[in-house]
Amino acid sequence: MDITHASDQKINSENFAKLALDCVHKEYPNKISHTMQSDKDVMPPRELTPAFYGCYDWHSSVHGHWLLTRLAKLYPDSELAPKAIAALEISLSEENLQQESVYVSGKGRKAFERPYGIAWLLQLAAELDDWDEPLAKEWRENIRPLEEILFSRVVEWLPKLTYPVRSGQHAQTAFALGLMLDWARTANNREVESLIRNRILEFYSDDKKCPIHYEPSGADFLSPCLAEADLMRRVMSPSEFAVWLNDFLDVPNSNTTWLEPAIVSDRSDPKLAHIDGLNLSRAWMLEGIASGLPPKDLRIKALSAAAAEHQESGLIGVNSEFYEGGHWLGSFAIYLVTKRGVLIQKIK
């Protein structure tokens, strides 16, 4: 199936939405990242974080809500839209989000879900920003206090981050900064945008010869090399980015197979299933890199061909057979097929 075709994409998107609808209010199984100070802090997930307690963990719940928001906004006449809106109405109440703010402000939680979960929360806020659904305006205001707490932590943390984290999992700096930068631009927060942009250039502008042949590690769901390149195209003009990429990544000037999709050996294993997410994120990062180059750059063909291969491989694993992947892969699929990262306007 060619998911780039509009009708096929809508069908696939509805299937992915079902994965999120099935888990945003499913409390168990659950893996909480919970710092406790005493016995009184022992509570079930629905009481600790009543907006984002489903989908196995907090960050997956957040981007599950992002998925529902994005699809209901893109396909308002679809069968999934009213179901998505109903789920969002339950989760994004003022009371629930007030408790989320109380929770993240608790003692010992200064680094809660930093940077990955924070980045997705900011994406959810950005997705609500320009939605003409009447309830969305209410939800946008409900989530604003939590948003302000979390982006203020980014503002405090980034200047202290001496070195970027170059892993292929949640702690990776490059991927999170890309989502955060996109949020800052959508929110028209010039101060935070400038901070993030400057740190990106300080961290990565001198990097050369990224060893992509060392990738992936066994539980990666993000590519360190591709995430960095996809980030840099957001802060450089096409001509600047083309020169930087020359030194950073060896991409052929022809439509040849140069980066093969990673192999998933066991989708019932929560860590090994990360590889499906890697293929999906590689696909959107390759597309993003191609979009940042001058239109006649000869590397675009190879980047686009590799993106298509990774998309095809990654989408195979996006289903409800195993909750290990089903609770989160739908969000990655939607980020890819709806071109979310590519569509954000970048500074030229």
Each predicted region: which residue ranges?
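Well-ordered alpha-helical scaffold segments within catalytic/enzyme domains
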Residues: D2-A6, H65-S78, A119-L135, A176-N188, ...
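Low-complexity, Ser/Thr/Pro/Gly-enriched N-terminal "stalk/linker" regions
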Residues: D2-Y53
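Solvent-exposed loop and edge beta-strand segments that line ligand/cofactor-binding
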Residues: H5-Q9, R46-V62, V102-I118, K160-T173, ...
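Extended, well-ordered alpha-helical scaffold segments
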Residues: Q9-L19, S78-E95, P134-W157, N189-D207, ...
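Extended ligand-binding groove/face enriched in aromatic
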Residues: V62, L71-A184
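Loop-centered beta-sheet repeat module
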Residues: R153-E228
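Flexible internal linker/loop segments at domain or repeat junctions
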Residues: V243-P270
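Fungal-biased detection of long, low-complexity, Ser/Thr-
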Residues: I263-K348
